[in-house]
Curated annotation (Swiss-Prot):
Organism of provenance: Mycobacterium leprae (strain TN)
Protein name, as recorded: Small ribosomal subunit protein uS5
GO terms for cellular component: small ribosomal subunit
Gene transcribed to yield this protein: rpsE
Molecular-function GO terms, alphabetical: rRNA binding; structural constituent of ribosome
Keyword line: Ribonucleoprotein, Ribosomal protein, RNA-binding, rRNA-binding
Disulfide bonds: none
């Protein structure tokens, strides 16, 4: 009788653990699927300390880049007592700071330079097949944004935080050729070479008069 009771108890525990494991696995799969929609890059993790009356209190900070690989990217900075919690906070902040990067055929629309504190980053468009020619922190931002061909160079501080924010500042300065042409009352292919030295606008944008319908020959 006791053996039967023990067997029933074991079966019930096994069934309960199987059900709980299945539910946890389902939740984990849901989280992985949601995470799979975005590219996440942890650029830097630092340990910081705070001196209090009882001694020192240690915590961790994480600089995280999140993007969809198709022109949306954001930067987040998280702080917590544990590394995973700091990364999670950084990811949440990065998703709240998403912005759109104008891209044409996998590269940026024109050369641009961004600055943040002592960080200075220069970005130039590149022809297809060039790849992402950039350093670690700059590369993380560009890859998450979905840039496939670009030339980048850091001209200022090597601090990862400054470099990342300088890269973001540069990307936020980008403009689409058709928008600039519309403001100037020009065709998209008539922009000066000084603004578009790589010829991206004239070759890959819609070439038509602004505000008028092209007369048929």
């Amino acid at each position: 009788m006791a053996a039967q009771s023990a067997g029933l108890l074991g079966d019930s525990r096994e069934g309960r653990s199987r059900r709980e494991g299945g539910s946890r696995g389902g939740r984990d799969r849901d989280r992985d699927g949601e995470k799979g929609n975005y590219l996440e890059r942890v650029v830097a993790i630092n340990r910081v300390s705070k001196v209090v009356k009882g001694g020192r209190r240690f915590s961790f900070t994480a600089l995280v880049i999140v993007g969809d690989g198709h022109g949306m990217v954001g930067v987040g900075y998280g702080k917590a007592k544990e590394v995973p919690a700091a990364i999670a906070k950084g990811v949440e902040e990065a998703r709240k700071s998403f912005f759109r990067v104008p891209l044409i055929d996998g590269t940026i629309t024109h050369p641009v330079q961004g600055e943040a504190a002592a960080g200075v980053v220069l970005l130039r468009p590149a022809s297809p097949g060039t790849g992402v020619i950039a350093g670690g922190a700059v590369r993380a931002v560009l890859e998450c944004a979905g840039v496939h061909d670009i030339l980048a160079k850091s001209l200022g501080s090597d601090n990862a935080i400054n470099v990342v924010h300088a890269t973001v500042a540069a990307l936020k300065l980008l403009q689409r050729p058709d928008e600039v042409a519309a403001r100037r009352g020009l065709r998209s292919g008539m922009l000066p070479r000084s603004w578009d030295p790589a010829g991206v606008a004239g070759e890959r944008s819609v070439d038509r008069p602004v505000g008028r319908v092209r007369e048929q020959a």
